């Protein structure tokens, strides 16, 4: 008896095993992410075979993990094909999204001395401190580098740590880093040393020995792309293609609204009020509502009407390759900008997306806008953040200078 997965294909028999009840939802999940009929069918067949194998091995749904997927590929009679491994990864990701199986925990069965300490610290951050996954990802390599710097491949005795070890490591580590990364290093190191003292591995407060990274927030001038280069870049995009239509709208939003890349990629359909001509932005400090310039609105509408794939996602801008969904993070837009700059041959001061934000602020300053007005558009919470743009236009600054007492008028 055939088992119809959807209107387009069926399995030769009903699936069996712990994953059987998830076969149809898994197929729908794949279709929603833009996978074609052939790819969806192949992945569903792989999932059904995996489920049968799990049943034969007596493995329950809640016990499934990545190791089982690897064993199944080795046990199969059929020769592994390109895409088999990816199909099982997608299935496990889907099952985790349904809370059917636990999140995968990477286990090193023969960890080094350094790695044992890193893993214990990671468990502390996750279980005792309940820190976010991204924070743990940021802290782990710092601790690994610090322990390797001090102890190498030898035995680790945290009781031997001295303040000089801490300062030497920080000085060598942060000399090559920008301000943001340097602060992550010092914060992670303080966290680890506080943890070590809490455990009794060290008795001194070595966290206090971690140097403070100076924060000269106004020490550098923002590197802004010029207005002519923005026009040239936008003109170079082929808006007759779906990808070009999307890229044009996204880059125009960067340039005309001064949005952060994360704010562009997280825009949702409900954030745009077409009648009032307003757009809601999810900024660093909550939501901010801005007027929607006509050219930006027209570009977004053109993309939605002509080029956006049909998809259940509420994100405005979607990826062009499967899985079809919103961008996972701002790096996708950064790649679009870098490719566009390279294609056009524009020698911009930087290759990132923030140059458009700086460019808008500089143009507003030259046009007579106050720092308060610029900060409101950019979503700055404090005027000190916006004050850095006052260094950009010396001619504008000269008009603000007061005459010295007694100076000839």
UniProtKB/Swiss-Prot annotation:
The keyword Magnesium does not apply. GO terms for molecular function: DNA binding. This is Putative integrase/recombinase y4rA. PANTHER family: PHAGE INTEGRASE-RELATED, TYROSINE RECOMBINASE XERD. PROSITE patterns: CB (PS51900), TYR_RECOMBINASE (PS51898). Keywords: DNA integration, DNA recombination, DNA-binding, Plasmid, Transposable element, Viral genome integration, Virus entry into host cell. Residues 112-197 form the Core-binding (CB) domain. InterPro entries: CB, DNA_brk_join_enz, Integrase-like_cat_sf, Integrase_catalytic, Integrase_recombinase_N, Integrase_SAM-like_N, Tyrosine_recombinase_XerCD. Belongs to the 'phage' integrase family.
């Amino acid at each position: 008896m055939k088992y119809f997965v959807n209107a387009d294909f069926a399995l030769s028999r009903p699936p069996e095993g712990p994953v059987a009840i998830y076969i149809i939802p898994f197929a729908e999940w794949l279709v929603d992410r833009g996978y074609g009929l052939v790819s969806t069918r192949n992945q569903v067949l792989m999932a059904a075979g995996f489920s049968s194998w799990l049943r034969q091995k007596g493995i329950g749904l809640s016990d499934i993990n990545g190791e089982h997927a690897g064993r199944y590929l080795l046990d199969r009679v059929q020769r592994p094909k390109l895409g088999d491994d990816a199909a099982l990864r997608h299935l496990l990701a889907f099952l985790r999204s349904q809370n059917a199986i636990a999140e995968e925990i990477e286990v090193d069965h023969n960890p080094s001395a350094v790695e044992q300490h890193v893993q214990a610290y990671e468990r502390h951050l996750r279980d005792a401190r309940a820190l976010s996954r991204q924070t743990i990802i940021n802290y782990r390599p710092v601790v690994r580098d610090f322990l390797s710097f001090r102890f190498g491949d030898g035995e680790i005795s945290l009781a031997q740590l001295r303040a000089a070890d801490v300062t030497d490591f920080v000085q060598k580590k942060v000399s090559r880093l920008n301000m943001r990364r340097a602060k992550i290093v010092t914060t992670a190191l303080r966290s680890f040393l506080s943890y070590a003292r809490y455990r009794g591995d060290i008795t001194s407060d070595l966290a206090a020995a971690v140097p403070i990274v100076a924060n000269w927030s106004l020490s550098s001038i923002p590197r802004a792309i010029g207005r002519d280069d923005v026009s040239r870049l936008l003109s170079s995009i082929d808006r007759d293609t779906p990808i070009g239509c999307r890229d044009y709208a996204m880059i125009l939003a960067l340039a005309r609204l001064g949005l952060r890349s994360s704010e562009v990629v997280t825009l949702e359909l409900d954030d745009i009020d077409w009648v009032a001509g307003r757009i809601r932005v999810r900024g660093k400090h909550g939501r901010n509502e801005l007027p929607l310039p006509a050219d930006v609105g027209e570009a977004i509408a053109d993309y939605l009407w002509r080029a956006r794939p049909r998809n259940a996602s509420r994100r405005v801008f979607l990826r062009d390759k499967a899985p079809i969904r919103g961008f996972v993070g701002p790096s996708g837009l950064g790649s679009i900008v870098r490719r566009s700059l390279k294609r056009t041959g524009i020698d911009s001061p930087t290759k990132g997306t923030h140059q458009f934000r700086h460019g808008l602020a500089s143009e507003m300053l030259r046009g007579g806008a106050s720092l308060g007005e610029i900060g409101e558009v950019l979503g700055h919470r404090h005027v000190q953040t916006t004050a850095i743009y006052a260094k950009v236009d010396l001619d504008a600054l000269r008009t603000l200078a007061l005459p010295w007492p007694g100076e000839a008028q």
